[in-house]
């Protein structure tokens, strides 16, 4: 079964603020200084478009014994039998290097010996229940 990444209004606002700020400055400045505004506006708009593309291409799929995590071109597979524990996470700051989730409330999956990953499926409880059906030895930490 496939699960989409949860959506956070907070993340959208944080990514839109620079675009709107540069656009506002560009509107209220003299015409000569508008040329200075276009490069930052272009960069922030491009970053917002990339963020949007990443959001719409991020999903988590449970395929038999494998958890597939997909984000645009990057895909990773985790054997569900190797998942040790799942921890609910509500922190905005994440210590994980790889974080294919677009909401600050998600779950951290610990697998192998030292590996972990943060994801944010829309239906966390249903997602965890399906993982537990395949591997009932997964420890759930609240």
What label would you give each PLM region?
Residues 33-43:
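Hydrophobic alpha-helical transmembrane segments
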Residues 46-80:
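Conserved beta-hairpin
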Residues 70-126:
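Non-transmembrane, membrane-adjacent beta-strand/coil modules in membrane-associated proteins
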Residues 16-23, 42-52:
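Hydrophobic alpha-helical transmembrane segments of multipass integral membrane proteins
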Residues 1-32, 104-108, 114:
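N-terminal membrane-targeting/pre-transmembrane regions
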Residues 139-142:
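Conserved short beta-strand edge segments in small beta-sheet-based binding/regulatory domains
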């Amino acid at each position: 079964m496939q699960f989409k990444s949860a959506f956070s209004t907070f993340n959208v606002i944080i990514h839109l603020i620079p675009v709107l700020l540069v656009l506002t400055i560009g509107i209220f400045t003299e015409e000569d200084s508008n040329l200075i505004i276009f490069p930052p506006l272009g960069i922030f708009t491009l970053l917002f478009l990339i963020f949007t593309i990443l959001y719409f291409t991020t999903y988590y799929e449970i395929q038999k014994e494998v958890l597939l995590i997909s984000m645009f071109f990057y895909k990773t597979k985790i054997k569900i039998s190797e998942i040790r524990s799942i921890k609910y996470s509500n922190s905005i700051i994440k210590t994980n290097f790889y974080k294919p989730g677009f909401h600050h409330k998600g779950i951290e999956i610990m697998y192998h010996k030292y590996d972990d990953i943060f994801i944010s499926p829309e239906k966390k409880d249903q997602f965890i229940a399906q993982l537990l059906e395949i591997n009932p030895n997964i420890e759930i930490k609240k």
